[in-house]
C-alpha cells in the first residue's frame, strides 16, 4: 500500500514486509542503522512466545538512543470484552474470526517485556533488554455512537521505549 502511494520516494523511505519475530533482519537494513521503529497494533498480533525475539531484533536495528513508538490494545478494551468463549487462546490472547490473533496488554506487563524489570516486585536491576521506558501510558476513551445509542469503552497502551546509549551488564 505504501509503495503504491504517489508520494512514495525510495530516496527518502524504504517500505518492506518483515517478520519481526524471525532471526533475520529486514532487507537492506544493518544493525544499529535505524533511528525510530513505529509499532502500531503489531505486538498484539504476535504470540507471547515471540515477544523476546522481537524486542531483541528491534534492539539490534536501532542506533544507540533510538526509540520505539508503540501503540496497542490495553486490557479491558471493548474488543476484548466482545470475544466469545471459543476465541480464547490463552490469558488475554484471542483469535479473531479471520484467523488473526490479538493480545491485550497491561502497563506493568509492557515494562517487563521491554526492560526485563518486574515493577510489581520493585525491581531496581538495570534493564536486561537494553531498553528503558521513556514514556508509557494508558489511553482510555469512551466513544459514543449517538445514532445507535452505543457506548464503547476503548483502552490502548501508548509508549516510547528508548535504546540505552551504553550496553547494560547482564
Residue ranges of predicted features:
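Hydrophobic adenine-recognition pocket in adenosine-nucleotide-binding enzymes
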Residues: 42
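A conserved beta-strand element that flanks and buttresses the S-adenosyl-L-methionine
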Residues: 38, 69
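Class I SAM-dependent methyltransferase SAM/SAH-binding core
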Residues: 1-26
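A short glycine-rich, Lys/Arg-flanked "PGG" loop and its adjoining helix->strand segment in the class I
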Residues: 51-67
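A short acidic, Gly/Pro-enriched loop at the edge of an enzyme's catalytic core
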Residues: 23-37
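C-terminal alpha-helical "lid/dimerization" subdomain adjacent to the S-adenosyl-L-methionine
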Residues: 74-145
Amino acid at each position: 500500500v505504501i509503495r503504491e502511494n504517489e508520494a512514495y520516494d525510495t530516496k527518502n523511505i524504504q517500505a518492506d514486509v518483515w517478520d519481526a519475530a524471525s532471526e533475520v533482519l529486514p532487507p537492506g537494513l544493518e544493525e544499529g542503522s535505524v533511528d525510530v521503529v513505529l509499532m502500531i497494533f503489531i505486538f498484539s498480533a504476535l504470540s507471547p512466545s515471540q515477544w523476546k525475539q522481537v524486542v531483541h531484533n528491534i534492539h539490534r536495528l536501532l542506533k544507540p538512543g533510538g526509540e520505539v513508538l508503540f501503540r496497542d490494545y490495553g486490557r479491558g478494551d471493548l474488543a476484548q470484552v466482545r470475544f466469545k468463549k471459543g476465541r480464547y487462546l490463552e490469558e488475554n490472547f484471542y483469535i479473531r474470526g479471520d484467523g488473526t490473533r490479538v493480545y491485550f496488554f497491561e502497563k506493568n506487563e509492557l515494562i517487563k517485556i521491554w526492560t526485563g524489570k518486574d515493577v510489581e516486585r520493585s525491581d531496581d536491576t538495570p534493564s536486561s533488554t537494553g531498553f528503558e521506558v521513556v514514556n508509557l501510558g494508558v489511553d482510555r476513551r469512551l466513544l459514543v455512537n449517538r445514532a445507535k445509542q452505543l457506548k464503547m469503552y476503548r483502552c490502548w497502551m501508548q509508549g516510547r521505549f528508548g535504546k540505552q546509549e551504553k550496553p547494560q551488564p547482564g
